[in-house]
Swiss-Prot record:
Its EC number is 2.7.1.4. One of its GO terms (molecular function) is ATP binding. The keyword Nucleotide-binding applies. Belongs to the carbohydrate kinase PfkB family. PROSITE patterns: PFKB_KINASES_1, PFKB_KINASES_2. This is Fructokinase. It comes from the Bacteria. Signal peptide: none annotated. Gene3D superfamilies: 3.40.1190.20. Keywords: ATP-binding, Carbohydrate metabolism, Kinase, Nucleotide-binding, Transferase. One of its GO terms (biological process) is fructose metabolic process.
Amino acid sequence: MNQVWVTGDAVVDLIPESETSLLKCPGGAPANVAVAIARLSGKSAFFGRVGDDPFGRFMQSILDQEGVCTEFLIKDPEQRTSTVVVDLDDQGERSFTFMVKPSADQFMSVEDMGNFKQGDWLHVCSISLANEPSRSSTFEAIKRAKAAGGFISFDPNLRDEVWQDQSEIQAVVMKAVAMADVVKFSEEELLFLTDSTSMAQGLQQIAAMNIALVLVTQGAKGVWRVFESQSELITGQVVSPIDTTGAGDAFVGGLLACLSRHADWKNHPVVSSAIQWANGCGALATTQKGAMTALPTQTELLRFIGQ
């Protein structure tokens, strides 16, 4: 089993509990992925920055409790932990208000990262590419991981409001896409980043980039898989969603927890199994409020997907 390094933002999500109160929940896409992997008995480590404040200490405590390695998590005394108010509609779909700009995660430096080894995975989201110095540090981490013989997983997870210059989004994010071995898009992200008007057009552009595995999630419809020049829509389990916050992160966590178990993962049996894990985790994550609350253990996941 190989280590999965995760970098970016560890966030406190404030989720409506009633008309007059907010529920404090641990979140942030990279942190969610790290916890998802750990719950599935994988090896995950988080590197990056939180504030040396109550929310930062809360996030480190959560990651430690979940079995995520936090040796390289820096508590920055000069910055504040990312805090996001999450608003849910009647269907459990969410919108975000970022309360701290810039937050501590945007100040990650090259000195913060761990030591990558052959076969390790590095998972990155685009928030860490939004501004300097985090952008340069993240691209350096990608280069170091690849040079060590590792693999790169990238989830754009676009949040326009975090970028100081939104005109940079497409070019910067597509640079990261081109460096990745595995990329997970939402349908909206694929269309935006490729300037496409249809899924087919967007997938055609991405296929030309020779990325080993591309996944495009479409919510309840399933996920498009592009692997070895073949594309296929794969459906998953149907649940009644309560809160979709973190569903995409759970999907990625399930995917990487499975892929990281295999030194030779670029084959149909492993990829198919990984997508089954990903779909199961993504579905289960929507069944309770909070991004991490319903992340399954390996036993719970295998029971859910019938293995």
